[in-house]
């Protein structure tokens, strides 16, 4: 069953990286709206599935636009190998995007607008900007917008009235949900920017081993600096500081472990090293999101979301994530 070409086309392991983005945004903006959160759980579920459908539509459309390149570099993929017809893939992409937009419309007009913006951004990336200078910037923007998408439920008519006094956006405790939302979005942006920058060399045979090794060292230093900045801001912004720190330290440890292993692989084959880093950084996005969720709702909530890495890792052994 895991060898089914449609599962490979949809890259099922990747699906588990999507819900945490939405949950982070949802919790960030709803911390000061505890009375409204219960009635908004349905919106959270709808936004999660909408985001998943948009993501799947993006993956399929990516393979449709890349079919000529994949015939040379990845001939075993479902489309270039002929296991799935191009027309079938096109229908799947249209269906996924349509479902994503329709579900968003059930939340509110802002959610629908963001879902439309996500779809347009995904298609522009796949068609025009995937191989250009703006590649990492656009992909990072799309994924960070997904976090904001999770917070879009707040514009529903039933909760907008709660914002009229402005007290919830900047509470007496000094906590600002909007600043936390911005921080979480920036964290996801940075992570995806690094990931996408690296993935550019994934199918390039002329990757220099020495250059890759230097890149790994630079990335590790950059990550360390970024985490220090994030930690400093998080201490001020999040309610559950210790819970956040626990998972951030886990994230830091896993990032260090990832690049240490990649450095050893570099001596064998640069291309395989890039694939290894890209795949695992995608999985580690779940842990990064889980840290913010722990800071927003406690360690238990963050730990539960972090468990999404398990099906991601297991399925990733049989189905390519890149």
Describe each model-derived feature in a short phrase:
Residues 2, 7, 152-322:
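C-terminal membrane-associated helical module and adjoining short loops/tails
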Residues 18-65, 97-105, 110-125, 176-193, ...:
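Membrane-embedded alpha-helical segments that form the functional core of polytopic membrane enzymes
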Residues 13-17, 21, 42-50, 88-92, ...:
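Alpha-helical transmembrane segments of integral membrane proteins
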